[in-house]
Regions:
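Alpha-helical solenoid repeat scaffolds of the TPR/TPR-like class and their adjacent stem/linker regions
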Residues: 1-186, 200-234
Length: 234
């Protein structure tokens, strides 16, 4: 996890690590998954809401949890059905922040420790968008991310570098977190030409950086809401 703090382009290294992991563990080779438009869950057919799933170990009193809770609270529930899947392979007991995540989610599930069982559970849910708040802090979640579970798969800013993973489609972060890394002589950002580097909305823009295997989408702002847990240390 410390490779991101060396001041180098880590994409070749991350791709090599990803390839090595799939060589050592053939079960991590991604298996094809299909989604049929006429086979959606009844809840989505009734509400029209997208099923957005967050998968992480860190739905707890941890920096990732503190920065993510408010984000989930502020998502528009008329558009999104929010599902939280907590990985419990080495931190099984919940804490007060875990309970807060349980309250703000439409559904809360603790994933089986067995990887095959966890994959089967997730694929039964017909998730539209799968979001990993971070990838890089524990091997189990990294391994899970080798598999295609949803049509769209994203990673947030919790670990600030590319995954090098071909089945992670988008890296979602803040212009304040990664834009300086893109703004070099060989990859300039032209703020005068809005169509060349940005599109979508007033809140986000797409950045065509070369240091990420994912499509990079940056918030015009921090893209986080900090939650201070009573009695905890920031």
């Amino acid at each position: 996890m410390f490779i991101g703090y060396q001041g180098i382009d880590v994409l070749p290294v991350q791709r090599a690590i990803h390839a090595l992991r799939t060589t050592v563990y053939p079960s991590l080779q991604p298996q094809p998954a299909t989604w049929k438009a006429n086979n959606l869950p009844s809840s989505q057919e009734a509400t029209g809401r997208r099923r957005i799933a967050f998968v992480s170990t860190w739905f707890r009193n941890h920096s990732v949890g503190k920065l993510l809770l408010g984000v989930i609270e502020h998502l528009d529930r008329t558009k999104f059905h929010i599902e939280i899947y907590r990985c419990v392979h080495f931190l099984q007991l919940p804490d007060e922040l875990t309970d807060a995540f349980r309250r703000v989610a439409d559904t809360y599930t603790e994933l089986p420790v067995d990887m095959d069982d966890a994959l089967a559970l997730l694929r039964r849910e017909y998730i539209d968008v799968l979001i990993y708040p971070e990838l890089g802090m524990d091997e189990w979640t990294l391994s899970l991310a080798h598999h295609r579970i949803a049509p769209v798969q994203c990673v947030f800013w919790g670990h600030p570098i590319t995954t090098g993973n071909p089945v992670v489609d988008y890296f979602i972060s803040s212009e304040y977190f990664v834009s300086d890394f893109f703004d070099s002589d060989d990859n300039p950002r032209d703020d005068k030409n809005d169509s060349a580097d940005k599109k979508d909305s007033a809140d986000t823009f797409i950045h065509h950086g070369t240091h990420f295997s994912e499509q990079v989408v940056l918030f015009r702002g921090l893209g986080t809401f900090f939650t201070q847990v009573p009695g905890s240390v920031i």
